[in-house]
Curated annotation (Swiss-Prot):
Residue ranges of domain CS in the record: 276-374
Gene Ontology biological process terms, A to Z: axonemal dynein complex assembly; cerebrospinal fluid circulation; cilium assembly; cilium movement involved in cell motility; convergent extension involved in gastrulation; determination of left/right symmetry; dorsal/ventral pattern formation; embryonic heart tube morphogenesis
Family membership: Belongs to the tilB family.
Keyword set includes Cytoplasm: yes
Identification of the protein by name: Dynein axonemal assembly factor 11
Pfam family, one: LRR_9
Gene from which this protein is expressed: dnaaf11
Keyword Iron: no
Record field: compositional bias (Polar residues): 193-211, 369-378
LRR repeats: 20-43, 44-65, 66-89, 90-110
Source organism superkingdom: Eukaryota
Quaternary organization: Interacts with dvl2. Interacts with kur.
Gene Ontology cellular component annotations, sorted alphabetically: cilium; cytoplasm; cytosol; dynein axonemal particle; extracellular region
C-alpha cells in the first residue's frame, strides 16, 4: 500500500518549487493510494485535488479544505458519499466508476452551496429507476449532472415527483445493499480475497513471491484469470490489483537477476583460432622490409593505456580493449619475445611490431646520398657543355639585312594615313553673340 507522505507531495509539487503549504493544485492519481490522509494538515490552500485511479474505499480527511473547488475521485472503491460538508467552496465533484450504491447519501451534498457539477456515471446507483430525478430534486444547487445540463423545467418536474421517486429509489437501494451483503459473505468464503481486502485497508498487504513456472503455464493462468467471470465489486478490483502487482514484482525480480553472458568462442575445440573483433575497431596489417609484421590497431584516442591488454602468440594476436576482445590470426609465425607495442600520442593508435620467425633474405635498397650544391652546379655545367651544339641549316643566298625585308617604293603605301578635319558650313541665319566665350 502506498501512503500519502510528505516526500510524495513534495515530488508532486515541483511546479510550486517544492512548497506544500501554499500548494493550490495536487495530482496524486495512479499511485495505488488506499487512504486519504495528511492532505488537510499540510495543504490547507488546495483548490484542485486529483485522486483518480487509486484504491480509496472511503472519503475522509478533506473537511478542512475550505478552498477546495474540484475533487476528482474517479476509479476508486467509494461506496458512500460522505464527509464533504466542510468543503465550503466545492464546485465540482467527480465520482465516475466507483461503487456508490447508497444513493440516499447524495443528500449530504445539499450543504455544499457552491456545488455545480456532479458525476456519478458508472456507479450502481446510476442504474436506479428515477436516479436523475432524485439527484436533481435533492441537490437543488446543481447545474449539471453527468455532463448534462439541468434545465429549469426538469428541476420543477423532479421536485413535483420527489416523494414517489424517493420511495422507488429507497426500495432499489435496499435491494442493492442486500445483494452487496451477499457479495461480502461470498468474499469471506475465499480467504485470499478477504485477506487482501483486510490487508489493503490496514496497510499491511504483502505479495507472495512468484513460483517458477513454465512460460506456457504462466500464459494459461493469466488468460484464465482475466477470462473468469466475476461480479464488479471492490473485492474484485482489489484482486485484480493484487494480481497486477504480483506480476509487476515478478518482472522486476527477473530484471534484477544478473544476466550471465555466454562466453565468446575464441578457439574452437579442434584448436582452430578465430578472428574476433568485439570492440569493432579498424585495423591494418602489413609487412615491412625488416621482416616484421606491423599491426596498426585504431584504438580510441582518449582511452587510457591501462585499459589495454596485449597478448602476442606465435600464430595470433589478442588485444583486450575495455574487456572486449580483438583477436587476429597472423599469416606467418612471429617471435612473441621480440615483439613490441607502441602507442601514438596524437592519434591514439596501437602499433604492434611483430618480427617474423622465418626471416627472408631480401636485397637492400640503394640509398641515394644527397650531394652538395656546388657539385650539382658543376655537373649541370658539364652536362650542358658536353653535348654537341645543333644548328638549323640556312641558305646563305637568302641572307640579307633587315632593311631589305620591305621593298623600296612601297613604304608610302604602308604608312598610316591621317584623316583631315572638315569644317562645317555656317548657317545664313547665324548671328554671333559676343557675350558667349569662345570654345577651348
Amino acid at each position: 500500500m502506498v501512503r500519502i507522505s510528505e516526500d510524495l507531495i513534495r515530488r508532486r509539487a515541483e511546479h510550486n518549487n517544492g512548497e506544500i503549504f501554499s500548494l493550490e493544485e495536487l495530482s496524486l492519481h495512479q499511485q495505488d493510494i488506499q487512504r486519504i490522509e495528511h492532505i488537510h494538515k499540510w495543504c490547507r490552500d488546495l483548490k484542485i485535488l486529483y485522486l483518480q485511479n487509486n484504491l480509496i474505499p472511503k472519503i475522509e480527511n478533506v473537511g478542512r479544505l475550505k478552498k477546495l473547488e474540484y475533487l476528482n475521485l474517479a476509479l476508486n472503491n467509494i461506496e458512500v458519499i460522505e464527509n464533504l460538508e466542510g468543503c465550503e467552496s466545492l464546485q465540482k465533484l467527480d465520482l465516475t466508476v466507483n461503487f456508490v450504491g447508497r444513493l440516499s447519501s447524495v443528500e449530504t451534498l445539499k450543504h455544499n452551496l457552491h456545488l455545480k457539477e456532479l458525476y456519478l456515471v458508472g456507479n450502481p446507483c446510476a442504474e436506479y429507476q428515477g436516479y436523475r430525478q432524485y439527484v436533481v430534486a435533492t441537490v437543488p444547487q446543481l447545474q449539471s449532472l453527468d455532463g448534462k445540463e439541468i434545465s429549469r423545467a426538469e428541476r420543477i418536474q423532479a421536485l413535483q415527483e420527489l416523494d414517489a421517486v424517493r420511495t422507488r429509489v429507497l426500495q432499489q437501494e435496499t435491494k442493492y445493499l442486500e445483494e452487496r451483503e451477499k457479495q461480502k459473505s461470498n468474499a469471506n468464503e475465499h480467504p485470499e480475497i478477504n485477506q487482501s481486502l483486510s490487508e489493503s485497508q490496514n496497510g499491511t498487504q504483502q505479495y507472495p513471491e512468484s513460483s517458477s513456472k513454465t512460460h506456457t503455464e504462466a500464459e494459461d493462468e493469466e488468460r484464465e484469470f482475466w477470462e473468469k467471470p466475476c461480479p464488479f465489486t471492490p473485492e474484485s478490483r482489489l484482486e485484480a490489483h493484487r494480481h497486477l502487482e504480483e506480476k509487476r514484482r515478478a518482472n522486476e525480480k527477473e530484471k534484477e537477476k544478473p544476466k550471465t553472458k555466454t562466453p565468446r568462442t575464441l578457439i574452437t575445440p579442434d584448436g582452430r583460432v578465430l578472428n574476433v573483433n568485439e570492440p569493432k575497431l579498424d585495423f591494418s596489417l602489413f609487412e615491412d622490409e625488416n621482416n616484421c609484421l606491423l599491426l596498426d590497431l585504431h584504438v580510441y584516442r582518449h582511452m587510457d593505456s591501462s585499459l589495454l591488454d596485449v597478448d602476442v602468440q606465435p600464430m595470433y594476436v589478442r588485444v583486450t580493449v575495455k574487456g572486449k576482445v580483438f583477436q587476429l590470426v597472423l599469416p606467418a609465425e612471429v617471435k612473441p619475445d621480440s615483439s613490441s607495442a607502441q602507442r601514438s600520442q596524437t592519434t591514439g593508435h596501437l602499433l604492434l611490431i611483430l618480427p617474423l620467425a622465418n626471416e627472408d633474405v631480401k636485397p637492400k635498397k640503394r640509398t641515394i646520398r644527397p650531394t652538395s650544391v656546388t657539385s650539382n652546379q658543376n655537373n649541370k655545367k658539364d652536362t650542358r657543355a658536353a653535348p654537341r651544339r645543333e644548328l638549323l641549316e640556312v641558305d646563305p643566298g637568302l641572307a640579307g639585312s633587315l632593311a631589305n625585308i620591305v621593298p623600296k617604293g612601297q613604304e608610302s603605301s604602308h604608312n598610316p594615313q591621317r584623316c583631315g578635319l572638315e569644317e562645317r558650313p555656317v548657317s545664313k541665319d547665324f548671328v554671333d553673340d559676343p557675350e558667349v566665350p569662345p570654345l577651348m
